[in-house]
Amino acid sequence: MPLFSTAFRKDVMDYIVSFAQQNEHIVALVAVGSGSYGYIDELSDLDMVIAIDSDENLRAVMDYVSSQLYKRLNFIYFKQVPERRLHVYLTDNYLEIDIGYGAYTSAAAFRKNWKVLFDKSGTVDQAMRISWERIKANTSDGQIAECADAVWHNLMH
């Protein structure tokens, strides 16, 4: 199977936005990393956070997202990291999809690159902006966040 194309990556992202908006427990979807501003290159992966209405619905939402992805895509790798509330998928054409989960009331930006794709509550974008401004205000925290972002990118690619 050949490598994924940028058109395929866009189709997958559009599909995720579509099915996420339909779920009553998914409050917001946030693109993080390079996908929030247009991707680094044609091989960039999809990184996102799904904000849910409450932690009690975490398992149901994770199962829903996984089932929707498996309906349309073929995966050669899947890893669930429960303690980090993270799913990592690798499609058969090598598109990596990383999805984190958390309650929308805990929305916070820990890296500078993020974009709210939809927000049913109208509060996530502001919470992300406020939290990022706090990190930027403390230079050492901002530098730590930048280093963490670089380390994350190098580990995942």
What annotation goes with each model-predicted range?
Residues D14-Y15, V32-G35, P82-R85:
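Short alpha-helical segments and helix-capping/turn motifs at coil-helix boundaries
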